[in-house]
Swiss-Prot record:
The keyword Lipid metabolism applies. The lineage of its organism: Bacteria, Pseudomonadati, Pseudomonadota, Gammaproteobacteria, Lysobacterales. InterPro entries: FabA_FabZ, FabZ, HotDog_dom_sf. This is 3-hydroxyacyl-[acyl-carrier-protein] dehydratase FabZ. It comes from Xanthomonas campestris pv. campestris (strain ATCC 33913 / DSM 3586 / NCPPB 528 / LMG 568 / P 25). SUPFAM superfamilies: Thioesterase/thiol ester dehydrase-isomerase. The active site is at 57. It comes from the Bacteria. PANTHER family: 3-HYDROXYACYL-[ACYL-CARRIER-PROTEIN] DEHYDRATASE. GO terms for biological process: fatty acid biosynthetic process; lipid A biosynthetic process. Disulfide bonds: none annotated. Keywords: Cytoplasm, Lipid A biosynthesis, Lipid biosynthesis, Lipid metabolism, Lyase.
Amino acid sequence: MSHPIYELPIDVNQIQTLIPHRYPFLLIDRVIELDLEAKRIVGQKNVTINEPFFQGHFPTRPVMPGVLIIEALAQAGGVMTQLGLGRDALSKLFYMVKVDNARFNKQVVPGDVLILEVQMKRLIRNMGCYYGEAKVNGEIVASAEVMCAGARE
């Protein structure tokens, strides 16, 4: 199957045409690598002190919640799925239905650039299975296997 060529980086405006997430829950700022043949994507999230979750997690020592790092990986997988399958985000929603083997190795704090490396393992009907690693400065800070299911609006 021949895939269209996308000019990189894919910015946040283009990302918003592919997945339905919006501020404050859009957790991928750009796509910096994309290989649809290999079913691999690399996204980026610039973590700033202005993130709403830092107000309560934790006020005197802000740390990005691990579940949001996993969500960011799932969103990167969703972008890849939309680009690879040519689906319109308005007609198809993907819900995270399972997380396995989640590991959190290091805290993510304001000022970090979170790199989201996601590999699609399989796509069966409306179910996508992904493996993702989140990195800061080349070091794995979190990883997980994620399953997402598609559903009509």
